[in-house]
Structures are given as C-alpha cells and as structure tokens.
Amino acid sequence: MSESEPGRKWDRCMADALVKLGTGFGLGMVFSLTFFKRRKWPLAFGSGVGLGMAYSNCQHDFQAPYLLHGKYVKEQ
C-alpha cells in the first residue's frame, strides 16, 4: 500500500461524511418543518443517521485494504 492511499481514503471519508451529514440534516429539517411541529429531534436523528452511514462506509474502506473504489489493487 502506498503512502497516498490512506490519504485518499481519509479525504474520501471526510467528503462522504460531510455530504451524508448535510443530507441527513436537510431531510431532518424538512420532516421537522412539515410533520413534527418544528421539533429539534428530527434534525439530530437525521444528522446521526448520516454520520452513522458515513462511519460505516469509512470502516468498510479501511477494512478492505486491496479494494480501491471498486478496483482490485495488486500488491507489489
């Protein structure tokens, strides 16, 4: 494994976490405004689900060291 691979994986994990956090927060806001009378718990729930999904994806990326974005990488 080269030195740049973990850096790329961390960058991908952080970008994925920001996207999923923002999406979860946005969906929580929509549900909060439309169904739950402006309560705060849908925001926290949506954000938590997004972060949990991002954590799971990052964990999977770091557990499979020879798989990089769907391509098998041969060790030299």
Curated annotation (Swiss-Prot):
InterPro entries in the record: Mic10 (IPR007512)
Highest taxon, organism lineage: Eukaryota
A GO CC term attached to the entry: MICOS complex
Membrane topology, record value: Single-pass membrane protein
Nucleotidyltransferase found in the keyword field: no
Keywords tagged on the record: Acetylation, Membrane, Mitochondrion, Mitochondrion inner membrane, Transmembrane, Transmembrane helix
Subunit and interaction comment: Component of the mitochondrial contact site and cristae organizing system (MICOS) complex, composed of at least MICOS10/MIC10, CHCHD3/MIC19, CHCHD6/MIC25, APOOL/MIC27, IMMT/MIC60, APOO/MIC23/MIC26 and MICOS13/MIC13. This complex was also known under the names MINOS or MitOS complex. The MICOS complex associates with mitochondrial outer membrane proteins SAMM50, MTX1 and MTX2 (together described as components of the mitochondrial outer membrane sorting assembly machinery (SAM) complex) and DNAJC11, mitochondrial inner membrane protein TMEM11 and with HSPA9.
Protein's recorded name: MICOS complex subunit Mic10
Organism expressing this protein natively: Rattus norvegicus (Rat)
Taxonomic lineage from the root: Eukaryota, Metazoa, Chordata, Craniata, Vertebrata
Encoding gene, per UniProt annotation: Micos10
